[in-house]
């Protein structure tokens, strides 16, 4: 095992000369930050970052709170997610292998080589996300790295999981263990992110201080033959606004202290220093497109164009825009905005990096999936696949590869087929032939053979449609008048405090049991009363383990609009128990007024 060390200048220069002697396209990579974890009731029994409830009274915008009840859907099936844009394939679980496949194939088709998952420490939920992604990435020739948010380790998050790690010294010792874990399981192996023969990761901070990092790094041992990792250290100091012109920070003692440890200053989201004005009433601060370019110039001047041999991997940086109305600064109660400008902002960021492309080894994108901060490039309803096409356009220049856009739309078709086949299988249809075609299509997309992939997709769509025609479907509508409740309505209004049980008619329950497969939702109106700070819960009986997780059908809060709101909540077949034993179907629990409850199903045989 080789100790992790800071490369001396001479050794770094030699390694730099050796790695840059390879053909340019072999040494250049594109990675995208990956933000999670987002879940679904169907896959995980919870929602994760799709939901958000937070106070924002400190914001100067006048907005008092965030209330994104992601269990709620509208009449089109769109969930109330914590984001300003909606995923093109709908609200999915980051841990669903089909969704992971879709994202990886979409990224590959756009010229992206890997994801850097925002990661804090071993056994955190983001570590589970990392481990879920690795086998799919290995299957399709994709790389999985980390954007190490080591602040998570120094917050009390680690102490909640490991009470014995309760001092800064103990956290630094665990930092070393986490670093070794990354070396052994992320920075080496078939999915390791490697640029010019060197493993690389992004260090977001703001956790370890330089001395603590140096101590932890001194305890790490590298596998035999592994090159010293390149560490891209976030440098995103704020800058100032002078005479209506953004002026960036060009030097700071903090970044110098990290450079002394061999780290490479790398950009993150550009500063937003312009205060709210009449044209931007929804955000406390914003940036103009020109500000982004000014923000990037110090990286070009002091890192990209530098002959410093310690800069072994130089990374450009791009992002499409920002609108953090999904989170308001993660407790900071501050709304930020960078306009996408119809895709032009992303193009300008790429153009700035490409002007120095001969000096760059990689480009880092922020981000693939940060819906809450609103800088995702994953296809959305609002923006389509525009950002993926832009990524591919510049990836072709950067990596000297063909710009073949015919693969961009194929992963979404594959994902759609996966889900349709899944439903058919639940209805006891034999889907093996269709699934084999879908598998071949996915493999063809991963290898860049889009014509072959299209052929397999077309054949799979024909096979799936043929199976769908064999389904015998019928709808089942159950109005409130046919339901039984544990308490009577008062002037047409029912109260969920302390609880309200709802019972389906036996005939409906028998029909659901007899159906081979079904989809369904419960619809109701609730009075959006003054917030209490407490959640209202909707439970079912369930046999799915762990029951305390999968028994939750929905949880939500009121937002204080003083209006009646009509919503729908999905009833996940594998989660909700329907049987003939005595017991409720659903149970509302919390301070809530509701009315006009009804159930709606589509049954398949």
Question: What role is predicted for each listed range?
Answer:
Residues 469-516, 530, 544-546:
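Glycan-recognition and processing domains
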Residues 589-605:
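Exposed low-complexity, polar/acidic, P/S/T/G-rich flexible segments that act as propeptides
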Residues 514-523, 579:
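Extended extracellular/luminal ectodomain segments enriched in beta-structured repeat modules
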Residues 530-542, 580-582:
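Beta-strand acidic-aromatic groove motif in beta-rich domains, primarily in extracellular
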Residues 25-472, 570-574, 587-594:
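Glycan-processing catalytic domains of CAZymes
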Residues 523-531, 572-574:
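Solvent-exposed strand-to-loop "edge" motifs in beta-rich extracellular domains
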Residues 544-578:
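Extracellular carbohydrate recognition and processing domains
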Residues 8-18:
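Bacterial N-terminal signal peptides
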